[in-house]
Regions:
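Extracellular structured ligand-interaction cores
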Residues: 71, 99-101, 189-193, 205-207
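Pro/Thr/Ser/Gly-rich low-complexity, intrinsically disordered linker/stalk tracts
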Residues: 1-98, 219-267
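Extracellular low-complexity, O-glycosylation-prone stalks/linkers
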Residues: 88-115
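Short, compositionally biased serine/threonine- and acidic-rich segments at solvent-exposed termini, linkers
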Residues: 2-3, 13-15, 20-23, 36-38, ...
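Beta-strand-rich modules
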Residues: 100-104, 199-217
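Signal that preferentially marks extracellular ectodomain short beta-strand elements
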Residues: 155, 177-204
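Beta-strand-dominated extracellular/periplasmic modules and repeats
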Residues: 81, 98, 161-169, 189, ...
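Low-complexity, serine/threonine/proline-enriched polar segments
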Residues: 107-181, 266-267
Length: 267
């Protein structure tokens, strides 16, 4: 069989949703109590504390939980095929690697002044560092010790990442083993979610485009050793249309959009 040339992409639609927070949200002005359900790994610094899941679960609706900041909050759902684990007899459950690079584009469709310009960002979802976003545990098998860094980082398109950065070896939908990791926006910001603060913009209508891919070719599900068998499986599960039997895309590109989101500060 002949194959398509390299870099042929399979476009995979994803569900993208947006929340516009137009004024500061507090318990006093909104009448709501905000729950912070993000895992808290600070107890790892204390000795003689059981390393159990309940130790890391926050107290629901505790006072002082931080409400979402002003701006537009984007959160996207991964393709279902990438959120299901597989467990073989006698082995641990394995989850597939998910896209670890995301491009976010803000597009003004109706803006009153020049400040509401298009802007783009790149997310390194697998970035690990002290200046990352979400608390994330790491384990050193040599010293048999745990420590925590922060996962996920965003930078303006064109700035580029810094050199010699540290990255997670494998990014999956469950993170450290939390089945709600990818589904819970406060715990996966700059991983599978993004906050646009719309600084300096008072009003306008905007659309957002999000696109995700794999930084390493070998992590892409379209680039396995038995690629033709894998394509057959994907065509049955992902409903690939208009693809001939002798065609084979070599890269996955996830994409989603939100159209005509209205923004008016302090309203």
């Amino acid at each position: 069989m002949s194959q398509k040339q390299k870099n042929t992409k399979l476009l995979v639609p994803i569900y993208l949703e947006a929340l516009a927070v137009t004024k500061p949200m507090t318990a006093s002005n909104s009448g709501r109590t905000w729950a912070d359900l993000s895992p808290n790994f600070s107890s790892f610094r204390r000795r003689n504390v059981p390393k159990l899941g309940i130790q890391f679960a926050p107290v629901p609706f505790q006072k002082g939980a931080t409400p979402p900041d002003m701006g537009v909050h984007l959160h996207w759902a991964l393709p279902a095929e990438l959120t299901h684990g597989v467990q073989h007899l006698g082995e641990a459950m394995q989850f597939p690697t998910v896209p670890n690079r995301w491009f976010v584009l803000r597009i003004p469709t109706d803006a009153p002044d020049d400040r509401a310009r298009a802007k783009a960002w790149v997310l390194e979802s697998d970035y690990l560092g002290r200046d990352g976003t979400n608390t994330f545990l790491t384990y050193d098998p040599k010293s048999e010790t745990f420590s925590y860094l922060r996962l996920g980082k965003a930078f303006a398109y064109g700035d580029g990442p810094k050199e010699n950065q540290n990255y997670l070896q494998q990014l999956t939908a469950i993170g450290l083993g939390n089945p709600l990791f990818a589904a819970f926006y406060p715990g996966c910001r700059n991983v599978f979610g993004f906050h646009d603060d719309l600084a300096g913009i008072d009003a306008g209508t905007f659309s957002y485009l999000v696109a995700g891919w794999y930084a390493q070719d070998e992590d892409d599900p379209l680039n396995p050793a038995d690629k033709w068998q894998r394509l057959k499986e994907l065509k049955s599960k992902w409903n690939v249309v208009d693809l001939a039997d002798d065609e084979y895309p070599t890269e996955t590109l996830c994409h989603g959009t939100v159209h005509s989101l209205q923004w008016a500060r302090n309203t």
